[in-house]
């Protein structure tokens, strides 16, 4: 035991280094009597060896003893106050005893033995010591103060030396009054303020134990019992009575900075989250859920718009509609300072956000213009009422422009008004014609922004504005930005978007404003009538499909699987293949004709599958009517004359004439759903008239107008309970006339009032229209586009819960719906993350001056009396429209106007000083003429020239000499053949001169004498009269053409073609007479030494001939005056 005692003393000395050996027994003796630590525990029915624990358990128990939370259950131990039992203490020297034993796991799970159902408790965060933000720990329960502080009010039973008995009664909650609770709260706040000065716990070293000295004052202040906080904790959660453990008090030590905590944390603020994020201060922080945004800090030139500096200090948020929605507040604030794309589900207030932003830019600017554009006129009209009733923009400053207004009237509106509601087509026309000034526009609001792709008018408007104006804001509104990453990026690029605010129905900040929508998906199978029609049509089309298969133009076998898109792609692929390119014209015409017939009937197959037998029958009748008489092609008549086709028509005709016939199972289910809905709502129970008010409304979406008319026909049988009406677009189609915008607005108003309680709409009713409260949406056919699917479903559930019924056929239509749903959810996640998109923050201007930070001003907007007028703010028509103003060309900033030289484009602008200064030409100095001796070669230089430069190195001495003009006379009469470089004009003149010289014979003197005598006798009379003007023009044209000499051309033809005389003179006649007596040419090189007949003949020099020839040709040319400068001077 001696070794054990020595090791125990060493063990205790590690924690009490400041106590001497003499003072240690006294300190230990005093601590035993006054220590409030828990009593010793020993295991029941066990020996001392059973109570011994392994070192790991000892260290674990020491760690829990500091926090006051034992490790094992209370049922396994009994209180033992025997001071002499030292076997329960484990010495560090006994670690070797368990060295070879396998250590059990230190992780244990507490399982209460007396489990009872506890009610949910909502508590705030308890007082906690500072901890590093990267460490995540569990909750810490604070034990109550010692019971001695409340001895006068809470009696306890003790056994032994003042220790509470196990069956001591617990303190009641009723014993604590409000003063005690207030004192606890005050103490908690005081601990928060002193949090910076408290030392953080160390994770590497054991705590240093020091003597604890308590003063009565401290004990009285901390004597508040907080056991009521542990009322709902199970009784066996602790091993011993919790009232026996004293509270752990931290010692006051100098504060040290650890874990990289921020030094500028304000006092009195508690840490509520990780990484130094503190709670909000109510005095300077916005309400919970709202954010504070400021204009971005950018270095940009001042805007050209005139700003109202008094209004820039605040931005107004209207509270006319009641409660402020956090998401609308945050989105509107961000849309004021960034080019923003807002993606909100339908019915969540995109119009309110747009009206708020329009109001603030209307306040901030003095004369700038604000434009709201929407695809259709009904969408434009419904936005006007929102701006009048919510934002309070004066009606006198607002106008609605469409293409129906005259250009002169629109020009006046652009000059006088500031807020415009219009379609994008009208806007781009006014911008291009110069009626609208692009530099005055400060805000462009785009509704249904998912259309801003490709060459749509939205994209064209933004590009046009960007050319002339760099200081305007863009706000884009939509419910679904796109179905693919590429389409969303196209919208961002087309509108220069810098930020995206997207919300889904699962977003936390809009969940309380989204009403529940019960979606019911109903699938159907083909009816017996549909199967019969499919079989007969398959037999009709099978021969045509087989012909395409034999030509490898189409691979499908089942005619019922034909689609217009598939046939079009197959035709393109076959035409691009080798078989299609190499096929003869007849085969190509045959394949194209078969594809055209099958594509027309593929649409009929879709109508039969998904819409009903009646639309299918109407399409077949139209197909059959195209073959009457001589109309239609070979294969179209082959289909109509087929026996199966005739049998099909005979079956369909009596079915469609029956008014009670319903040609599709979806239509039968639709009728029952609509009837049940109105009967549950009590519609038409008292025989109401058709113009009475309706409490509930239904909207049915279809894909084709034929389907809409068929659904309306079936539902009209049950009037006045069901009062349906068709709602289609403006364009007219075969067998169906379109609806004008005025008619569309009238139907929407009647639907809101209850005149019609059911609308059967095509895609025109999907986008944007505020058609009132709809309680039931029926999608008669599925759309593979997630945009259209979401637009349809967004018509209901705006102000109360709504229902959606999807009618789908098994197979392709059901798969399309699942694909659209998955695609929508995936795209919403991608857009919200923003990691796969490129935003244009660099071209999103600040517009506001630097240093301006508008503060939110929530207030009620006073609506002007003029806004109460219900009519649209369209310009009034006049008897005589004003004259259209002349087109105005708006120039971008820093553009150079006027004309400029092409040479100055690359050199850049020159200053006037450079133009005025001309470089002075220096006077040339006379060159001194060298002496003759310095120019002439010396004898040595002459020899070097002869040997090195004129000797060609042959056996006999040969020297290079100048070309001889009399050598090779026969070859010099014609142009020698060339390969790359052709003969020049000088060469051709030289050849002509030599040819003329060759014509001179020895008897030329006698011949010319005879000619002169004959000419003097006739005195120059002409044999042939003057030529006609036509001949003269031909001769002049021939003279302008270049003359070419060829080997096959005779010398006489060359002579005749080069004559300059205009009349046929006797010389021509004589030359033609003596033509047969032509002699061989004579050359001087052929003369013999004995021939002295022409010794006196001296031929002219070659330079003289060339010079005179050039002077004669130049005499006929007209000189031109060339202007060296094209300037205005």
Curated annotation (Swiss-Prot):
<feature type="region of interest" description="Disordered">
    <location>
        <begin position="236"/>
        <end position="306"/>
    </location>
</feature>
<keyword id="KW-0547">Nucleotide-binding</keyword>
<feature type="short sequence motif" description="DEAH box">
    <location>
        <begin position="447"/>
        <end position="450"/>
    </location>
</feature>
<dbReference type="GO" id="GO:0033677">
    <property type="term" value="F:DNA/RNA helicase activity"/>
</dbReference>
<dbReference type="InterPro" id="IPR044749">
    <property type="entry name" value="FANCM_DEXDc"/>
</dbReference>
<dbReference type="GO" id="GO:0060543">
    <property type="term" value="P:negative regulation of strand invasion"/>
</dbReference>
<feature type="region of interest" description="Disordered">
    <location>
        <begin position="1"/>
        <end position="101"/>
    </location>
</feature>
<feature type="compositionally biased region" description="Polar residues">
    <location>
        <begin position="1077"/>
        <end position="1086"/>
    </location>
</feature>
<feature type="compositionally biased region" description="Polar residues">
    <location>
        <begin position="242"/>
        <end position="285"/>
    </location>
</feature>
<dbReference type="GO" id="GO:0000400">
    <property type="term" value="F:four-way junction DNA binding"/>
</dbReference>
<comment type="similarity">
    <text>Belongs to the DEAD box helicase family. DEAH subfamily. FANCM sub-subfamily.</text>
</comment>
<dbReference type="GO" id="GO:0007535">
    <property type="term" value="P:donor selection"/>
</dbReference>
<dbReference type="GO" id="GO:0009378">
    <property type="term" value="F:four-way junction helicase activity"/>
</dbReference>
<dbReference type="GO" id="GO:0070336">
    <property type="term" value="F:flap-structured DNA binding"/>
</dbReference>
<feature type="compositionally biased region" description="Basic residues">
    <location>
        <begin position="877"/>
        <end position="889"/>
    </location>
</feature>
<feature type="region of interest" description="Disordered">
    <location>
        <begin position="863"/>
        <end position="930"/>
    </location>
</feature>
<dbReference type="GO" id="GO:0043138">
    <property type="term" value="F:3'-5' DNA helicase activity"/>
</dbReference>
<feature type="region of interest" description="Disordered">
    <location>
        <begin position="1072"/>
        <end position="1129"/>
    </location>
</feature>
<feature type="region of interest" description="Disordered">
    <location>
        <begin position="124"/>
        <end position="222"/>
    </location>
</feature>
<dbReference type="GO" id="GO:0016887">
    <property type="term" value="F:ATP hydrolysis activity"/>
</dbReference>
<keyword id="KW-0539">Nucleus</keyword>
<feature type="compositionally biased region" description="Basic and acidic residues">
    <location>
        <begin position="297"/>
        <end position="306"/>
    </location>
</feature>
<dbReference type="GO" id="GO:0036297">
    <property type="term" value="P:interstrand cross-link repair"/>
</dbReference>
<comment type="subunit">
    <text>Interacts with the MHF histone-fold complex to form the FANCM-MHF complex.</text>
</comment>
<protein>
    <recommendedName>
        <fullName>ATP-dependent DNA helicase mph1</fullName>
        <ecNumber>3.6.4.12</ecNumber>
    </recommendedName>
</protein>
<feature type="compositionally biased region" description="Polar residues">
    <location>
        <begin position="203"/>
        <end position="222"/>
    </location>
</feature>
<feature type="compositionally biased region" description="Basic residues">
    <location>
        <begin position="1028"/>
        <end position="1044"/>
    </location>
</feature>
<feature type="domain" description="Helicase ATP-binding">
    <location>
        <begin position="331"/>
        <end position="499"/>
    </location>
</feature>
<dbReference type="Pfam" id="PF04851">
    <property type="entry name" value="ResIII"/>
</dbReference>
<keyword id="KW-0227">DNA damage</keyword>
<dbReference type="GO" id="GO:0045003">
    <property type="term" value="P:double-strand break repair via synthesis-dependent strand annealing"/>
</dbReference>
<feature type="region of interest" description="Disordered">
    <location>
        <begin position="1018"/>
        <end position="1060"/>
    </location>
</feature>
<dbReference type="Pfam" id="PF00271">
    <property type="entry name" value="Helicase_C"/>
</dbReference>
<keyword id="KW-0067">ATP-binding</keyword>
<keyword id="KW-0347">Helicase</keyword>
<dbReference type="InterPro" id="IPR027417">
    <property type="entry name" value="P-loop_NTPase"/>
</dbReference>
<dbReference type="InterPro" id="IPR039686">
    <property type="entry name" value="FANCM/Mph1-like_ID"/>
</dbReference>
<dbReference type="GO" id="GO:0005634">
    <property type="term" value="C:nucleus"/>
</dbReference>
<dbReference type="GO" id="GO:0005524">
    <property type="term" value="F:ATP binding"/>
</dbReference>
<keyword id="KW-0238">DNA-binding</keyword>
<dbReference type="GO" id="GO:0033567">
    <property type="term" value="P:DNA replication, Okazaki fragment processing"/>
</dbReference>
<keyword id="KW-0234">DNA repair</keyword>
């Amino acid at each position: 035991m001696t070794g054990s005692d020595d090791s125990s003393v060493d063990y205790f000395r590690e924690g009490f280094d400041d106590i001497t050996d003499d003072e240690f027994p006294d300190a230990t003796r005093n601590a035993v009597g006054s220590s409030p630590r828990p009593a010793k525990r020993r295991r029941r029915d066990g020996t001392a060896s059973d109570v011994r624990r392994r070192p790991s358990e000892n260290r674990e128990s020491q760690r829990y003893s500091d926090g006051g939370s034992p490790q094992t259950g209370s049922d396994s131990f009994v209180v033992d106050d025997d001071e002499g039992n030292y076997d329960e203490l484990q010495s560090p020297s006994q670690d070797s005893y368990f060295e070879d034993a396998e250590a059990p796991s230190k992780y244990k799970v507490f399982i209460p033995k007396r489990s009872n159902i506890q009610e949910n408790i909502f508590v705030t965060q308890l007082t906690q010591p500072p901890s590093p933000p990267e460490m995540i720990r569990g909750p810490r329960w604070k034990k109550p103060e010692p019971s001695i502080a409340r001895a006068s009010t809470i009696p306890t039973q003790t056994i032994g030396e003042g220790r509470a008995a196990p069956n001591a009664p617990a303190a009641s909650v009723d014993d604590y009054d409000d003063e005690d609770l207030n004192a606890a709260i005050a103490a908690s706040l005081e601990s928060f303020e002193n949090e910076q000065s408290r030392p953080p716990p160390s994770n590497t070293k054991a705590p240093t134990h020091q003597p604890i000295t308590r003063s009565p004052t401290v004990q009285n202040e901390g004597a508040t019992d907080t056991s009521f906080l542990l009322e709902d904790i199970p009784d066996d959660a602790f091993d011993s009575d919790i009232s026996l453990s004293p509270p752990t008090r931290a010692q006051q030590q100098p504060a040290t900075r650890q874990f990289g905590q921020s030094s500028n944390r304000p006092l009195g603020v508690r840490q509520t989250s990780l990484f130094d994020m503190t709670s909000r201060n109510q005095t300077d922080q916005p309400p919970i859920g709202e954010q504070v945004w400021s204009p971005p800090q950018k270095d940009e030139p001042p805007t050209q718009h005139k700003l109202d500096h008094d209004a820039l200090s605040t931005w107004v948020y209207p509270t006319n509609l009641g409660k402020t929605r956090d998401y609308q507040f945050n989105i509107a604030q961000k849309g004021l300072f960034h080019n923003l794309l807002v993606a909100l589900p339908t019915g969540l207030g995109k119009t309110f956000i747009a009206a708020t932003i329009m109001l603030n830019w209307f306040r901030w600017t003095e004369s700038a213009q604000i434009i709201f554009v929407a695809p259709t006129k009904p969408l434009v009209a419904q936005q006007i009422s929102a701006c009048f009733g919510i934002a309070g923009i004066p009606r006198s400053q607002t106008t609605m422009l469409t293409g129906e207004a005259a250009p002169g009237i629109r020009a006046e509106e652009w000059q006088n008004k500031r807020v415009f509601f219009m379609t994008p087509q009208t806007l781009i026309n006014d911008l291009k014609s110069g009626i609208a000034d692009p530099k005055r526009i400060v805000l462009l609001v785009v509704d249904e922004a998912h259309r801003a792709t490709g060459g749509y008018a939205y994209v064209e408007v933004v590009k046009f504005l960007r050319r002339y104006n760099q200081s305007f804001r863009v706000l884009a509104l939509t419910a679904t930005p796109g179905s693919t990453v590429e389409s969303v990026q196209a919208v961002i690029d087309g509108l220069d978007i810098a930020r995206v605010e997207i919300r889904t129905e699962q977003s936390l900040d809009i969940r309380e404003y989204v009403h529940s929508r019960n979606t019911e998906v109903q699938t159907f199978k083909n009816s017996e009538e549909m199967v019969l029609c499919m079989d007969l049509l398959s037999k009709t089309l099978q021969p045509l499909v087989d012909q395409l298969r034999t030509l490898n133009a189409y691979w499908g076998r089942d005619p019922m699987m034909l689609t217009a898109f598939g046939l079009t792609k197959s035709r393109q692929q076959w035409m691009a293949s080798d078989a299609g390119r190499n096929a003869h014209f007849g085969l190509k015409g045959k394949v194209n004709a078969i594809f055209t017939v099958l594509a027309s009937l593929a649409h009929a197959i879709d109508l039969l599958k998904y819409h009903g037998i009646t639309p299918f029958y109407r399409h077949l009748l139209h197909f059959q009517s195209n073959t009457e008489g001589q109309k239609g092609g070979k294969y179209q008549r082959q289909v109509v004359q087929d026996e199966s086709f005739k049998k099909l028509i005979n079956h369909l005709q009596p079915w469609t004439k029956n008014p009670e016939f319903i040609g599709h199972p979806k239509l039968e289910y639709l009728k029952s759903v609509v009837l049940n809905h109105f009967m549950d709502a009590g519609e038409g129970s008292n025989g109401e008239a058709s113009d009475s008010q309706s409490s509930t409304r239904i909207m049915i979406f279809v894909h084709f107008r034929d389907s809409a008319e068929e659904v309306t026909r079936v539902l009209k049988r049950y009037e006045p309970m069901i009062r349906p009406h068709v709602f289609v677009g403006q364009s007219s189609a075969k067998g169906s006339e379109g609806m004008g915008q005025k008619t569309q607005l009238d139907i929407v108003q009647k639907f809101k009032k209850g005149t019609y309680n059911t609308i059967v709409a095509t895609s025109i009713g999907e986008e944007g229209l505020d058609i009132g409260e709809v309680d039931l949406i029926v999608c008669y056919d599925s759309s593979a586009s997630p945009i259209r699917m979401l637009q349809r479903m967004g018509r209901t559930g705006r102000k109360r819960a709504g229902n959606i019924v999807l009618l789908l056929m098994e197979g392709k239509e059901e798969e399309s719906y699942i694909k659209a749903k998955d695609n929508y959810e995936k795209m919403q996640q991608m857009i919200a993350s923003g990691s796969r998109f490129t935003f244009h923050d660099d071209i999103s201007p600040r517009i506001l001056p630097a240093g301006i930070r508008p503060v939110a001003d929530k207030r009620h907007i006073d609506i002007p009396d003029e806004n109460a007028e219900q009519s649209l703010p369209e310009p009034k028509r006049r008897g005589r429209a004003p004259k259209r103003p002349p087109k105005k060309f708006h120039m971008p900033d820093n553009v150079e106007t006027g004309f400029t030289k092409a040479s100055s484009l690359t050199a850049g602008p020159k200053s006037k000083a450079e133009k005025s200064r001309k470089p002075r030409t220096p006077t040339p100095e006379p060159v001194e003429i060298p002496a003759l001796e310095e120019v002439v070669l010396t004898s040595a230089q002459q020899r070097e020239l002869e040997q090195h430069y004129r000797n060609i190195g042959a056996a006999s001495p040969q020297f290079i000499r100048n070309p001889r003009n009399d050598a090779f006379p026969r070859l010099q009469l014609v142009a020698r053949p060339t390969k790359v470089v052709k003969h020049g004009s000088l060469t051709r003149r030289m050849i002509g001169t030599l040819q003329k010289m060759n014509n001179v014979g020895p008897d030329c003197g006698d011949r010319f004498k005879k000619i002169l005598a004959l000419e003097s006798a006739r005195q120059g009379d002409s044999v042939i009269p003057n030529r006609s003007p036509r001949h003269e023009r031909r001769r002049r044209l021939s003279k302008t053409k270049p003359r070419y000499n060829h080997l096959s051309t005779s010398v006489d033809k060359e002579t005749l073609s080069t004559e300059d005389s205009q009349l046929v003179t006797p010389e021509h006649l004589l030359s033609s007479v003596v033509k047969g007596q032509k002699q061989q040419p004579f050359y001087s090189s052929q003369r013999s030494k004995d021939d002295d007949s022409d010794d006196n003949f001296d031929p002219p020099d070659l330079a003289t001939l060339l010079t005179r020839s050039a002077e004669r040709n130049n005499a006929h040319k007209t000189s031109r005056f060339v202007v060296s400068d094209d300037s205005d001077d």
